[in-house]
C-alpha cells in the first residue's frame, strides 16, 4: 500500500504540479452508491496527514438515498469505495473541485443500480456540473438480461448519460475491472472461465482505465 506522495513520484506527477497543472478550475464528478456519511471529515484527516489543502467538496444526493447502516456490509463496502475514490482523486488533482454524487441503489452485477447512476450523471451534465466523470464500478456485460442471446437492449438503454456527455464535451472514465481479462458472474463472486468485458468501461463513449500493479524501489521509483 503506497502513499499519495509515493504515487506522485512513481507516475512523475510533480513536474505537472510545478507547471501549475493541478486540476484547478476543473470539477471531477465521482459517482457512488450510498456514498459515505463521514466523507468530508475523512478527506480532511487525509489531507492533514499528507499535507494537502482541503479541496472544495460538494456532496449531492440523487433519489431517496437511505440512511447509512453500519451493520449493512453493502453500505460499508460502498463507504470504503467512496472514501478511496474521493481521497485519491483529490491527491492526484489537488486543485480540482470534487462533486460526489450519491445514488440510492447498490450497483451490482446486471443492471441493478445503473439506472439511478446514469440519471444522476445526466442531471449533472445537463446542469453544467463536471468536466470529468469517474466511475469506479462496473458489471460484466454477460450479466445484463438478454446479452448472451444477442439482445443488448438492457445495456443500450443505459447509454443516455454518455451520449449527453459527448454532446457537452464531458470526459467519462470507468474502471476496467479487478480480475484481468475476466469478471464476475451474476453471483458477484464466481469468475467467468473465459474473457469477458465490464460495462461501462466497454462503452465506446467511455475511456476505460485499467488496473496497475505498482512496485517501487527504496527511492520510490518503479
Feature roles, as predicted:
Residues 1-211:
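Substrate-binding/charge-relay-adjacent region of secreted/lumenal peptidase catalytic domains
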Residues 206, 216-222:
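Predominantly extracellular beta-rich ligand-binding scaffolds that present long acidic/polar faces
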Amino acid at each position: 500500500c503506497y502513499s499519495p506522495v509515493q504515487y506522485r513520484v512513481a507516475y512523475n506527477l510533480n513536474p505537472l504540479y510545478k507547471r501549475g497543472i493541478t486540476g484547478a478550475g476543473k470539477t471531477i464528478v465521482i459517482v457512488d452508491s450510498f456514498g459515505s456519511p463521514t466523507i468530508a471529515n475523512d478527506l480532511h484527516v487525509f489531507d492533514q496527514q499528507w499535507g494537502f489543502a482541503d479541496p472544495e467538496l460538494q456532496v449531492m444526493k440523487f433519489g431517496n438515498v437511505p440512511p447509512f447502516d453500519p451493520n449493512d456490509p453493502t453500505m460499508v463496502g460502498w463507504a470504503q469505495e467512496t472514501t478511496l475514490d474521493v481521497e485519491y482523486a483529490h491527491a492526484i488533482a489537488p486543485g480540482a473541485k470534487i462533486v460526489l454524487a450519491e445514488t440510492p441503489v447498490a450497483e451490482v452485477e446486471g443492471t441493478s443500480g445503473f439506472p439511478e447512476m446514469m440519471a444522476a450523471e445526466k442531471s449533472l451534465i445537463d446542469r453544467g456540473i463536471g468536466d470529468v466523470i469517474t466511475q469506479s464500478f462496473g458489471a460484466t456485460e454477460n450479466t445484463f438480461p438478454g446479452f448472451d442471446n444477442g439482445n443488448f437492449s438492457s445495456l443500450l438503454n443505459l447509454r443516455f448519460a454518455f451520449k449527453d456527455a459527448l454532446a457537452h464535451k464531458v470526459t467519462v472514465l470507468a474502471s476496467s475491472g479487478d480480475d484481468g481479462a475476466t469478471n464476475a458472474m451474476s453471483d458477484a463472486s464466481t469468475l467467468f472461465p473465459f474473457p469477458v468485458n465490464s460495462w461501462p468501461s466497454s462503452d465506446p463513449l467511455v475511456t476505460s482505465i485499467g488496473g496497475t500493479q505498482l512496485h517501487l524501489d527504496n527511492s520510490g521509483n518503479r
